[in-house]
Amino acid sequence: MANQEQIIEAIKEMSVLELNDLVKAIEEEFGVTAAAPVAAAGAAAGGDAEAEKTDFDVELTSAGSSKIKVVKAVKEATGLGLKDAKELVDGAPKVIKEALPKEEAEKLKEALEEVGATVELK
C-alpha cells in the first residue's frame, strides 16, 4: 500500500480532468460529497444567501453546434491543453472554473456564449 507522500506526489502530477474523475470516484466509492458544508449552512440561514454570494462557478451545460470554437474558448480560459479542454467540453455538463468573482464569471459566461455554448453560473 502506498504511503501518504506517494499518494500526494501522484495527485500533484494529475491533470484537472484526472482530479475531477478521482473526486467523483471517491464520492461514489465512499458515499460522500465534496460539496462545501458552508454553502449548506448559508442556504439554511435565510433568503439573503443569494444576495451575499460573491463567488460563482461557471458550468458548461452544452457545447452547442460549434464545438471546436467552444473547445478553443475553454482552452484559452482555463489554460488547459487542447486534449484536456476537448475532454472537458465533451463531458458537459462540467464546471469550467470555480469560485470566480461575479464580474469575472459573467465575462467568461459571455465569452463562451458568444461561441455558441450554453453556460450557467452557480
UniProtKB/Swiss-Prot annotation:
Protein name (Swiss-Prot/TrEMBL): Large ribosomal subunit protein bL12
GO biological process: translation
GO molecular function: mRNA binding; structural constituent of ribosome
Keywords: Ribonucleoprotein, Ribosomal protein
Cellular component aspect of the GO annotation: cytosolic large ribosomal subunit
Gene name of the encoded protein: rplL
InterPro entries named in the record: Ribosomal_bL12, Ribosomal_bL12_C, Ribosomal_bL12_C/ClpS-like, Ribosomal_bL12_oligo, Ribosomal_bL12_oligo_N_sf
Subunit structure: Homodimer. Part of the ribosomal stalk of the 50S ribosomal subunit. Forms a multimeric L10(L12)X complex, where L10 forms an elongated spine to which 2 to 4 L12 dimers bind in a sequential fashion. Binds GTP-bound translation factors.
Function: Forms part of the ribosomal stalk which helps the ribosome interact with GTP-bound translation factors. Is thus essential for accurate translation.
Organism the protein comes from: Staphylococcus saprophyticus subsp. saprophyticus (strain ATCC 15305 / DSM 20229 / NCIMB 8711 / NCTC 7292 / S-41)
NCBIfam families in the record: L12 (TIGR00855)
